[in-house]
Amino acid sequence: MPRLKSIDTSVFIIRMLLSCIGMSQALSAYAQDGIRGRVLDEQGKGLDAAVVMLASLPDNVLMETTITDSNGQYLFPVHNGKFLLCIKTLGYKEFQKDITLAESQTLPDIHLEPEEISLKDAVVTARKSRPMTTSANGKIQIHVAQSYLTDAGNALDVLKHSPGISVNNKGDISLAALGGTAIYVNGRKLMLQGDELSTYLRTLSSEKISQIEISHNPDASFGADGSGGIINIILKASGRSGFFITTSHGVGYWENLKQNSDLAMSYNTDKWQLGLNYNHSIGHYAMDYGYEKVQNGDKNISETDDTDKRNTYSAGIDFSWQPNQKNRLFISSTVNVLAGPGETRTKTEIYQGTDRLVNILKARNNYIEQKNLQYNNSLSYQYRPSSNTQISFSADWTHFDGKARCEQPNEYFTADDTPIRSDFFYSGPDKDIDIYALLADYKYRPNAQNEILAGVKTTFIGSDNSCIFKKNGVMDTGRSNDFLYKEKNLEAYAQYTRTWNKIELSAGLRMEYMHTFSRLLSMTSQDAETNTGNHLRLFPNFSATYNINGKNKIALLYSRRQDKPRYEDLNPFEYLLDELSYWKGNPFLKPQVCNKIMLSYTWSSLSLNLHYNNLDDYFTSITDVYGSDKTIMTTKNIGTQQQVGFDAVFSKRLTPWWDFSTNVGLYYFMNKLDYETYRYEYRRPSCFLSSSNSFLLPLGINLEISGRFYSKRQGGSYEVCRPTGSVDLGLNKSWLDGCLRIALLMTDVFHTERWDRYGTKDNLILSSWGHGESRKILLRLTYGFGKQRFEKIDRNLEELNRL
């Protein structure tokens, strides 16, 4: 049987350009009967813009040519007879198969194999488009690996400098939308919270991250947590064969010297892959913050210098075994350590009225020991009995061990700096957390029009927290306690997607049953305080998408999601922060639930999103008066939040040497506070703007300029956040066919990234301010060697201009 001859480069380019011009006509043909199919990559994802050709046999006359859409789908008019189906796309082996056609039908999915080449054979003659931000179907993709963010240091630093993502001084991560944010890595939810989550993100090197995907309305296969949306950190996939090593080393400086290194080794065959990795980040991090409050007519001014001296270390091993196309086993184990001392120095001026200084409190927190040790272990198995069916099982175990020892001398002085008295406090909190999870997922795609997802998940969380508190060497039984928290979850979900020509409908439901138990044992009482809870909740989602043509798409999305309280926020005990401020948990916190609807429109490289969010049982940390001169911070369900928002994302190559992307958001917040005896409503508009520019300079140097701006906006309760923003600059250049790369960047050039806010509640007027060591200069060198198998190789200008 004769075969279609290899198509030379010029003919291939011409046909591909013609296919691009005729893309809208090809997509319009979906409304008609025809020959349908899908082209998938090695991970089972649809390949965009693959060239699909149909040639008659035996004369090899080319009958049809088209390209696949973003889901890897293609469509031909009906033909009768024997034909040769040929599929080509850069970076993958050419696919050819004899087929017989007689009527409209859906062909089986076609999986392309990556083309394996050596580094010395790769000749790049043009530059791939490098937008930092793109958007489609209501999702925003931040392309970390092709921007300066890959040199930022760790995952937490990447999130801090990513458009549309905010990270406060406590490490809390949020989006512009209402509610909390759930963090995923490669589609797997991180069950960690608070300090534990920050610890993990600080030990995840930015060099490992491929991209970040933000989704405000994910389907039911994702957990219900994250009422504001989810952030999915997608790590770089190993597309290398043989033995390969990559290593990077960086140094940074502004206020403190920092150094980070990571090393990754992999050995891959057709049947199995083994990977080892190590990274560390060493150096101090400085923060300055404070507040001014007027309580019952008396003013206090407090300023704090904070230096975090902890270092991070991480090591891991990955093993994957795939004996055939149907079975795959994956094992992963990592250990992360965040350890080291720390110190804060606080000076508080205490006034009688607003202008008469009467006392000065000087407090110091000396963290003589801080250690967070984290183990993550995962085992997963994937079975594909056929090309349209996939079953997967996974088991995860995460252990977190956190310890701290803090000495806190407090000294009181008169206005003329004469000593009055001093106290010496000591605290020793310990925290042990174990998280176990079992998951089973099922995916069935009988044809190109239907897809079914289903799964079950069960998790067990155990958190044991204890704290020893001493004053002047004597145990303070009123502030020493042991808090135990246990949580059991059983979840099940189903999602069905149906495509009719240009219309796609998807609906899903996730069910969650949660049982909680908490026990507080105080040293002042033999009786333990216990609380239990049982909840059954349903979380539906729905989306409808209409493909107007090849460049225009409109979608309507709805989802219901939640945020659960942090474990430590449920501890009802009272902790001393300094002699004028306290923190107390709340065992009666309820999850906050968000209903969200979004209308999304995509036109070529422009995406527009209009959304409305309603957050019930909203909880946040608030500051209230405590006695005549003290304040207490606690977390409460305080009412309802509503938000109307409009987002626009645009990315385009403006010239052959300039890639541009921008993200604009306009929002209107309504906080309806209704708790205890407090009733008040706060309304405020706000806006967000980010822009990223990538320039190709002479000598192959890439220059990147990125900036973000947040306007004045309503905070969590009665406070108002002041405007903030930052500008980053980056330079990088590669040698040796990309094996050697050097990057120089400066973050927050003008040192404008701050967390300032103010607010008034009853007889409390509070204004706080702060900033971290966000401005720094970083130099990073990356080197890799070995034989690589690239997922895509860009070889010619015409193909690259299409990207």
Regions found by a protein language model. Give the residues of each.
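Short acidic/polar hinge/loop motifs at secondary-structure boundaries
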Residues: 75-77, 155, 161, 188-216
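Outer-membrane beta-barrel signature, preferentially recognizing the C-terminal barrel domain
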Residues: 431, 481-487, 533, 562-616, ...
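N-terminal periplasmic accessory domains that precede
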Residues: 108-111, 155-158, 173, 197-201, ...
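Outer-membrane beta-barrel translocator/receptor signature
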Residues: 224-231, 239-289, 309-313
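Face-selective signature of the C-terminal outer-membrane beta-barrel domain
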Residues: 314-338, 366-521, 547, 551, ...
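Gram-negative outer-membrane beta-barrel transporters
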Residues: 637-713
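Short, acidic, small-residue-rich periplasmic hinge/interaction motif at the N-terminus
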Residues: 51-55, 88-90, 106-148, 168-170, ...
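Short, acidic Ser/Thr/Gly-rich low-complexity loop/linker segments typical of extracellular
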Residues: 57-73
